[in-house]
């Protein structure tokens, strides 16, 4: 039973309150009914650990098995349909698995949009030194895409243009997705001093991506990349999804929202963990140094990225698939010595009491960066390459938000600083105060 009533008695005032419970949730503003002489009751939730910010039909979990469901379909069901990017994009973003005709129409729209390469975008990317990290180049390239079409900016148009306008939202998600692929292709060619490979209007999205990024176009590589897309396309309210939705709540264009999500994802506690993890592996150096590294982790002197997971408290259900894909591509320590180091860390940690007691196991991210390396991406491109999968979920959340009532994200904070400064320089601290909106 998930609906009911919460009965509350406030010991401060002896007042009693009733708050409705629906689907195991309560509405946060209902707590404002609970008052005292010092003010209304507020919820303190750093990091939004127990706060629901939106209703969604995109990604959920089977309550019995815990299997992730994408619009009600499991990854296995989607794999069995041999879904390509266009199929899964249509499912998550537009809400239904496409017919062959709908999939082809979307493929064509994406491919044609990918042939649009504004000169300002080329100049923005090429203005960077070839040794630059991809992140600032991506941000600059996407920003240049926005500048090439000022009509996409709501503020310039005089206000909201996307919220409630499904047709314009559909154009927006396609343009943002194509823009990301173009920018990545330009960055790759610029850094490697190679000619830019333009998109082919006759190819699928991932066929164009592999050509533009000069990835090995082998059958198993594309098969595993597409299967990886399904698992990696969305994982609910990740930090980058929350940031995207926070940005979207002020109703800007989708590329601006995408920029905010990408910037957030590059932090070492999110997708940046994969790049940070590969850097950590390189610093270990050799197999014989793995035991000492793990001891340093246990002493909190070093950080082990890719172990433990906020959602998956036991074995990460994605991990078996990641290992299967590495095997399908015959990717072994012979191709990448760091893989042997990772396997040794996994082996030793799995039998170490410290990690066992804390339920710290290798998650999919611990091995995923080897997948992207096998697919042909450079180590410092790992987070950026991940976005070729996750952009589906990000665009799905943006479009869904544009269909729902909008509340601009505006939290409050609890001020705990000085309140009164005495003339004799003594600081008097009163009780912490909830900030009124400035």
Curated annotation (Swiss-Prot):
Q: Which GO terms describe its biological process?
A: carbohydrate metabolic process; tricarboxylic acid cycle
Copy the pathway line from the protein's UniProt record: Secondary metabolite biosynthesis
Q: Which domain of life is it from?
A: Eukaryota
The enzyme's E.C. designation:
2.3.3.-
Q: Which reaction does it catalyse?
A: (2E,10E)-dode-2,10-dicenoyl-CoA + oxaloacetate + H2O = (4E,11E)-2-hydroxytrideca-4,11-dien-1,2,3-tricarboxylate + CoA + H(+)
- Gene Ontology MF annotations: citrate (Si)-synthase activity
Name of this protein: Alkylcitrate synthase tstJ
Q: Gene of origin?
A: tstJ
């Amino acid at each position: 039973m998930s609906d009911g009533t919460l009965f509350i008695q406030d010991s401060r005032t002896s007042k009693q309150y009733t708050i409705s419970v629906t689907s195991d949730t309560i509405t946060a503003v209902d707590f404002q009914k609970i008052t005292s002489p010092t003010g209304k009751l507020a919820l303190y939730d750093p990091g939004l650990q127990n706060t629901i910010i939106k209703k969604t039909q995109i990604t959920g979990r089977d309550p019995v098995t815990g299997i992730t469901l994408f619009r009600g379909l499991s990854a296995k069901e989607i794999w069995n349909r041999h879904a390509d990017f266009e199929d899964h994009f249509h499912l998550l973003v537009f809400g239904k698995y496409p017919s062959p005709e709908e999939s082809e129409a979307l493929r064509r729209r994406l491919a044609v949009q990918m042939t649009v390469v504004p000169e300002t975008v080329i100049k923005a990317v090429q203005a960077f030194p070839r040794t630059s990290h991809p992140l600032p180049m991506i941000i600059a390239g996407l920003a240049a895409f926005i500048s090439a079409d000022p009509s996409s900016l709501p503020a310039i148009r005089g206000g909201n243009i996307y919220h409630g306008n499904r047709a314009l939202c559909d154009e927006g998600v396609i343009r943002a997705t194509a823009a990301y692929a173009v920018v990545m292709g330009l960055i790759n060619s610029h850094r490697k001093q190679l000619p830019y490979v333009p998109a082919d209007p006759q190819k699928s999205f991932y066929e164009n991506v592999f050509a533009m990024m000069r990835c090995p176009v082998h059958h198993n590589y594309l098969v595993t990349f597409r299967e990886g897309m399904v698992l990696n396309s969305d994982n609910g309210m990740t930090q980058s999804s929350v940031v995207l939705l926070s940005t979207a709540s002020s109703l800007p264009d989708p590329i601006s929202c995408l920029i905010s999500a990408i910037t957030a994802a590059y932090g070492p506690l999110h997708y940046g963990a994969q790049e940070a993890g590969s850097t950590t592996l390189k610093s270990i150096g050799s197999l014989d140094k793995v035991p000492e590294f793990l001891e340093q982790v246990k002493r909190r002197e070093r950080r082990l990225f890719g172990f433990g997971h906020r959602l998956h408290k036991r074995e990460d259900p994605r991990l078996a698939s990641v290992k299967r894909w590495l095997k399908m591509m015959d990717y072994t320590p012979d191709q990448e010595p760091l893989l042997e180091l990772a396997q040794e860390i996994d082996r030793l940690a799995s039998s170490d009491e410290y990690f066992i007691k804390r339920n710290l196991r290798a998650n999919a991210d611990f091995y995923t960066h080897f997948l992207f390396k096998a697919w042909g991406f450079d180590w410092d491109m790992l987070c950026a390459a991940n976005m070729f999968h996750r952009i589906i979920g990000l665009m799905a959340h943006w479009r869904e938000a544009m269909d729902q009532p909008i509340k601009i994200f505006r939290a409050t904070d609890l001020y705990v600083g000085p309140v009164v400064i005495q003339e004799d320089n003594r600081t008097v601290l009163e009780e912490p105060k909830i900030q009124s909106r400035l």
